[in-house]
Regions:
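Extended alpha-solenoid helical-repeat scaffolds
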Residues: 1-691
Length: 691
């Protein structure tokens, strides 16, 4: 009996050790998901799939991390192979019910699994899940019965259902609709009743995801790819969908989730409405009245602090130029408010104003594209008509002279039409640019123009307007308005840079960094001289700000939007950051940069100088960074040239640490230069100037 007990104990001890080994292996196998070797990636996926069958808890982490492989680039068989294998794995894990299930039970099982994939998912994971479901829907892997079950979960009213499940259902349905908009078109009433009705008002996240699903009714370029016949007619502003979308932005609440709802509701309005600017003008006017009517009731007699902020009585025009009546007292800048409601209301108003401004410039761009598309179609039709006319004319009897005259006349007409067409298109583009640059924020009939000075004042006087949420909303609004007009951008750029440098709120600093990145794309000539301020945020004490800055700079540099001067060393420091995500991002950046015209080689000396001069970097960290960077210098010619440049520094080194740094880098380079080897072998010489 004792022997049996001992063996049992040993068995369980070994089993526990085995479980620990499997759990410890999970992070390592997660890393293999990012391997360049296709077979390693596929085997890692298989490991997580098999482990899930044995209910190994840690494998759920790997299964979720697998999702990002849906973005594996590949026109090659290798890239497609990884993507296809991922879809097959997920199909077996979540989309295949046991054989014993009836069709109804199987549909319930799959719908439940799909909903569970949204639980606790990060925004990045949801984006990857959307792409996965998009591809699966395109390949016909999602049965109609499963979609019907998802609508049942979302629309159920008689029995209690958890918020998570209802949200999960509409998230998944919105994702499937990227491949097939008909999924949501047929259930608009359900969405208005649930997501934009009482349930949505009680659960703002449900309302947000309902707005996203509604937006899918109008297919984007991705959804209309490969000759899809899906067409969408935009809705008039009195349509029930648009009325409900406008109403959901006006729900009285102090819940921070309201901002997500308002953003997606405005996105949906701009996707679905024939005249979104008119409807959004109404939303802004009503919100302005609500906010400033409350302010004037509390402080009826206090004058406004700045004359230039006042609006002419009874004239606060709309985005589209139609006048509206808003008393001047309501639109004057707010004074110090003790009322929490006023501050919340103003924060929400500024958020709406900023987001509408951004959506309006996107809307103008779409109008321009639509105009050009229709004009091209019209020109093609005219060309066809002329061609058929020419063919019928040439078939008639007539002398060669007459025919040539007709051809000359036709060619002349074609040239004239081309000239007129070109001018018309250019005129339209010029008009759009003028509206964006001069009308939206400076036009006498523009509603947004009333808010530009107010936002600047709130941001500039953060000691007066102390509320954290108000400052966050105002900075975001300022940044979005700056993306509309280069004139407004130039006037407020010093203010935004000051906010980015000095704001005590990391969220505000992060938003300012993203905004500067956007402006570098919109108005490159203004931002190019100020990129140093952006690089400084890489040394921000908050990891969130540092990470945001690194991602922003990665995009700008790789897309060629900013010129790299001598600041890449700041990004190289991030390779040794305490935050693993920042270090991984930096590695990814340099790996991508190395594919662009010897960029690492060209900037290595500048990076080396900056790193070597920074006494805060210890020797081991410095060596790891240099070893990583020199791994991208592969050509012998480049190695020799770098070695010569670095060797010239040996004689100028003032400290032994500096000399060691140079010697270490030279040791990594395959230069095959005996003179350099001799210099290094002699070691560091302390040269003292005579007294």
């Amino acid at each position: 009996a004792i022997e049996k007990l001992t063996l049992t104990k040993r068995y369980y001890t070994e089993a526990l050790k085995f479980i620990d080994v499997l759990h410890e292996a999970t992070p390592v196998i997660c890393q293999l998901l990012g391997s360049k070797n296709k077979s390693e990636v596929i085997e890692a996926m298989d490991y997580f799939e098999i482990g899930d069958a044995y209910n190994i808890e840690q494998n759920k982490i790997g299964i979720r991390k697998m999702l990002r492989l849906i973005w594996t680039k590949g026109s090659s068989d290798e890239g497609k192979g990884v993507q296809t294998h991922l879809i097959e794995c997920y199909k077996r894990l979540f989309f295949e019910a046991p054989d014993s299930f009836s069709p109804n039970d199987a549909a319930n099982y799959i719908a439940r699994n799909m909903i569970s994939l949204t639980f606790g998912a990060t925004p990045a994971e949801l984006t990857s899940l959307e792409q996965l479901l998009h591809l699966m829907m395109k390949q016909g892997m999602i049965p109609d019965l499963v979609i019907a079950k998802l609508w049942q979960v979302y629309g159920v009213q008689r029995r209690e259902i958890s918020k998570k499940q209802r949200r999960g259902a509409i998230i998944v349905l919105g994702m499937l609709a990227t491949a097939s908009p008909e999924i949501v078109v047929g259930e608009m009433e359900t969405m208005l009743r649930i997501g934009l009705g009482a349930h949505g008002r009680a659960d703002l996240q449900l309302a947000k995801y309902t707005c996203i699903a509604l937006r899918r009714i109008n297919p984007t370029s991705r959804q209309t790819e490969k000759g899809s016949t899906t067409t969408f007619s935009r809705l008039s502003n009195d349509h029930a969908v648009l009325v409900k979308l406008a109403a959901i932005t006006e729900v009285p609440t102090d819940n921070k989730e309201w901002y997500g709802v308002a953003e997606q509701a405005i996105n949906a309005i701009y996707a679905l409405s024939k005249h979104p600017d008119v409807l959004c003008s109404e939303i802004i006017r009503r919100k302005t009245r609500a906010v400033f009517a409350r302010s004037t009731q509390q402080e009826p007699s206090r004058p406004s602090s700045r004359d230039e902020m006042q609006i002419e009585p009874s004239q606060a025009p709309t985005l589209d130029g139609a006048d509206s009546t808003v008393p001047a007292s309501q639109a004057s800048p707010i004074k110090r408010q003790n009322s929490k409601e006023s501050v919340i209301g103003l924060s929400q108003l500024l958020f709406i104003v900023g987001h509408v401004a951004i959506k309006q410039i996107v809307h103008l761009e779409l109008c321009e594209l639509d105009f050009k598309r229709r004009k091209q179609e019209k020109d093609k039709e005219k060309a066809k008509d002329r061609h058929s006319l020419g063919a019928s004319t040439s078939s008639r009897r007539g002398g060669g002279q007459n025919k040539s005259k007709q051809q000359q006349q036709q060619e002349q007409e074609d040239n004239e039409l081309d000239m007129i067409g070109g001018t018309t298109e250019d005129d339209f583009t010029e008009a759009m640019a003028h509206i964006r640059e001069r009308e939206l924020l400076f036009g006498p009939q523009s509603l947004l123009a009333q808010f530009g000075p107010m936002v600047s004042e709130i941001c500039a006087n953060n000691t007066v307007y102390k509320d954290r949420n108000l400052q966050q909303a105002a900075t975001l609004c300022l940044a979005k308005l700056m993306c509309v007009s280069s004139e407004y951008c130039e006037a407020n750029l010093p203010l935004l840079i000051t906010i980015m440098e000095r704001s005590p709120d990391p969220t505000v600093r992060s938003n300012a960094v993203i905004a500067l990145g956007d402006m570098a794309v919109c108005f490159n000539h203004l931002i190019d001289e100020n990129t140093d301020f952006l690089y400084r945020r890489l040394a921000d004490p908050q990891p969130m700000v540092k990470r945001t800055c690194l991602m922003t700079l990665t995009f700008l540099i790789l897309a060629g939007q900013v010129k790299v001067k001598g600041q890449l060393g700041e990004m190289a420091k991030c390779l040794e950051d305490e935050d693993k995500r920042i270090a991984d991002l930096a590695r990814m950046f340099f790996t991508e940069l190395s594919t662009k015209d010897n960029a690492v080689y060209n900037h290595f000396v500048d990076m080396f100088s900056l790193l070597s001069a920074d006494e805060r970097i210890d020797e081991e960290a410095f060596r790891r960074i240099v070893r990583f960077l020199l791994g991208f210098v592969e050509k012998d010619k480049h190695a020799k040239q770098l070695a010569e440049k670095l060797a010239a520094r040996l004689a100028r080194c003032e400290t032994e640490r500096q000399w060691n740094d140079v010697a270490f880098a030279l040791g990594l380079l395959q230069h095959k230069n005996e003179e350099i080897n001799k210099l290094v072998a002699e070691g560091f010489k302390m040269v003292q100037a005579p007294a």
